[in-house]
């Protein structure tokens, strides 16, 4: 026996067999040990050969284990193994078989054949008992080999390569394991048309990710199984090549090429009977490429050109351009079939076709209105992905969320269970007490506990019953689906008696039972478990994904929106027109009446400094998101140079920072529903306005990497001081309309008409009047009071002190900012000195009154300390 004549896998098996024999304390190395390791192999080549030869691998394993149990064991020997005569004969027979077949190496299948042939070995009897004869094994080996010989030490990898490195889609379709393919008839017909050509009969499906390229290949497999294809494609097999399995574990140079050649040889040997489907086809280019080695695409080219290899590829537009088009010799061998994104109507049809599979998986029902909502909402709000993939994901996640709720304990029952635990803890504590009040309390508590437990038991029983009903309906759906699959198989195989039983007996019976179960469905009034996915569930998932509030508004939210002006006016004083315009835009959006192709609202706020332009934007962010920082704030003074426009949308290719994206586009892409503030817009370079044109008109902007960013759910606010000099010259009683034309003239001279024409509203903020300063004092003092609250210090200002601050801080040219400085200087600075000096301990009350030209501070400390009085410096 020359070990070099044996393949690497056989050598590995022989090594394992010897180790096993020593572990079992056997002194002799027998054929039974070899058969044992062959049958225990994870890849199961020997077991597969036995099954294909009409035998039972499990039976062979049991018979061989029985033979092994009879072998003598010797404990405490020298640890050596001697070769038995039957095993030596097996090796000799295997070498003879390999020589006759023209093989250079003895492979696993020849070793198994020798174990079946050699009558002196008990393995022959074990295999015969299992139903695998030497003749049957020989026939199976010849079928697998297809005339090929074992010329390398890794020859087994080349046999039955399609089974190892490809999935049979037609077999999966036959067994009903593929999802139904709805629509896409034109693309499938075009694919069949290309496949039916004489040469270059290789279509490549090109389309955006998620439009259904792989589904078209599965649709083709379903059509082949149903016989709904031209004569030239009937009874063909569609095999999906697994590039990962081909590359995985290929350690040595040439091993990958050997595997791929084995796949190609098997496909060619079928004489056009196999169509190869290569998903992510761009992975072929460069796959397996190493120093001097050929990549996969170069190995495929000759077979593709001669028409010996039928192939269907699938890849995205970008990957096709980047990888396949760079190799014209490969590209010309494929015929592109463009797969467009389906429209909303087609997507709804696709969802209706898939609905049953998802209902069966999640064990919930999906309403038709939920499917319509999934298609329409995903199309409108999830702009960076494609239909139907994003709509299917929405439906899937909404059903998954509902199933999770069904499996979780209902809130009502959860509260009762928590109450029971609380009462039990209290009961144990009261048992230790002996006084009368504790005894009375314990009696009451026992009654309450018994009552609560009774309620909880009743609710638990009801919840379990409702869950059981859902489970019953789900089981019926599963049985109905299995019956329909069986009917399709029976019709294909000509088993008309069974088909008749299914069509007129079993299926109608199951349908009737399911209809009755759904009629008693537990999602009626007063039900604890919701089992139907509704549009609200879909809308909730969209809101969680995007942050855009599209789910149904609660009553409180509606009221809040209707009194939005009052809420905003709490922090922005005297600018009723601006507050009203912004509120109306938000209400339009939440009511679903805004133009779906434009931002929610776009405004220019004009007015002198310090009148509340930026403050209104912050208040709006606080109102919508409960966080005034939830906005993109861009100070246009930073965008005064021409090149700074690139910072908004991202640097172009070839420039530093290309991968990082733009300040504006990235912020909106991450959070599509927010306020975008362009502060001091007049300071920006004119090119910035060119970028904003498409944002204001179409609600979209293309960033430096070519991605389209959706601005349809943003509120765009631009602030400017243009024309403010006219407004500061107004009298207290003058109307803002008197200077509107002068201000607009200045605005029109600075901004181009095409920019101004796209703005929803240009709002003038008038200068603050003296009588409005009191309200601003209130707002500023509230902020100061909230800062002092941490120290439990209470601040009170009487009317005179407030009036003193309002008068001292009034400056029509500078708005509310001088008032902020006066409060800082006259109140905050003095308080800071007194706190640090120990005059105001924590928990004190500070009363502020006004003197003739200063504020007086009266401190009432916590109990037990004397009052102090001090005055602010003039």
Curated annotation (Swiss-Prot):
Keywords assigned: ATP-binding, Chaperone, Coiled coil, Cytoplasm, Nucleotide-binding, Repeat, Stress response
Region of interest (Linker), residue spans: 342-547
Subunit structure: Homohexamer. The oligomerization is ATP-dependent.
Main location: cytoplasm
SMART domains: AAA (SM00382), ClpB_D2-small (SM01086)
Family annotation (InterPro entries): AAA+_ATPase, ATPase_AAA_core, Chaperonin_ClpB, Clp_ATPase_C, Clp_N_dom_sf, Clp_R_dom, ClpA/B, ClpA/B_CS1
A GO molecular function held by the record: ATP hydrolysis activity
Renumbered residue ranges of the record's region NBD2: 557-767
Protein species of origin: Agrobacterium fabrum (strain C58 / ATCC 33970) (Agrobacterium tumefaciens (strain C58))
Protein name: Chaperone protein ClpB
Any coiled-coil regions, as ranges: 392-526
One Pfam match: AAA_2
